[in-house]
UniProtKB/Swiss-Prot annotation:
Gene3D superfamilies referenced in this protein's UniProt entry, alphabetically: SGNH hydrolase
Gene for this chain: PAFAH1B2
GO terms, biological process: lipid catabolic process; lipid metabolic process; positive regulation of macroautophagy; spermatogenesis
Tissue distribution of the protein: Ubiquitous.
Protein activity control: Beta subunit (PAFAH1B1) stimulates the acetylhydrolase activity of the alpha2/alpha2 catalytic homodimer.
Sequence positions bearing N-acetylserine: S2
Protein name as annotated: Platelet-activating factor acetylhydrolase IB subunit alpha2
A single MF term (Gene Ontology): platelet-activating factor acetyltransferase activity
Length: 229
């Protein structure tokens, strides 16, 4: 799979300020400040699927107690997340687990390029935060009825199932969650706009995610051993 300069989805790039209010950069700068002020055990980074998670009670129930930071920005692609992580959002912190959820907004890229962009994010995290265990959340199906974007996201997930096991400290969490019913439709009770999750939709994702995070946190006893010794 193409990486680096040959893959546009793997080239870090700040989001364009199309609307003219510079909100994207303001959010990034706030995240960089959070890195200086807080000590997260768990870091979430990605697009609106990450960002909106903190608006629901399940975030406060499952993830706030884990000292989690939410670095999600709506509309972000793999390129934007790469840029943010290269420019301060991995500095001054030492999280034990990093959750990555991005790729559904990479409309200009092929499935192969999107998967390569996600792999580039994992490789960057491994370089900057080698102690962290990484969880990549698979891309969700989207659209009320079957459509090409669903097929593309499914292909990204298939590619990641093959490629991520070759990288260190990372695992893919399947987020299918039974969102697509037997008739091929997605319910608005799970995704209110057939893309973004409702509270009930997030519950299907967050409960298994929380279980995996807890498992990984329990598997990082090395620091405790060194402090006890």
């Amino acid at each position: 799979m193409s990486q680096g300069d040959s893959n546009p989805a793997a080239i870090p790039h700040a989001a364009e300020d199309i609307q003219g209010d510079d909100r994207w950069m303001s959010q990034h700068n706030r995240f960089v400040l959070d890195c200086k002020d807080k000590e997260p055990d768990v870091l979430f980074v990605g697009d609106s699927m990450v960002q909106l998670m903190q608006q629901y009670e399940i975030w406060r129930e499952l993830f706030s107690p884990l000292h989690a930071l939410n670095f999600g920005i709506g509309g972000d692609t793999t390129r934007h997340v790469l840029w943010r992580l290269k420019n301060g959002e991995l500095e001054n912190i030492k999280p034990k687990v990093i959750v990555v959820w991005v790729g559904t907004n990479n409309h200009e890229n092929t499935a192969e390029e999107v998967a390569g962009g996600i792999e580039a994010i994992v490789q960057l995290i491994n370089t900057r935060q080698p102690q962290a265990k990484i969880i990549v959340l698979g891309l969700l199906p989207r659209g009320e009825k079957p459509n090409p974007l669903r097929q593309k996201n499914a292909k990204v997930n298939q590619l990641l199932k093959v490629s991520l096991p070759k990288l260190a400290n990372v695992q893919l969490l399947d987020t299918d969650g039974g969102f697509v019913h037997s008739d091929g439709a997605i319910s608005c009770h799970d995704m209110f706009d057939f893309l973004h999750l409702t509270g009930g939709g997030y519950a299907k994702i967050c409960k298994p995610l929380h279980e995996l995070i807890m498992q990984l946190l329990e598997e990082t006893p090395e620091e405790k051993q060194t402090t006890i010794a």
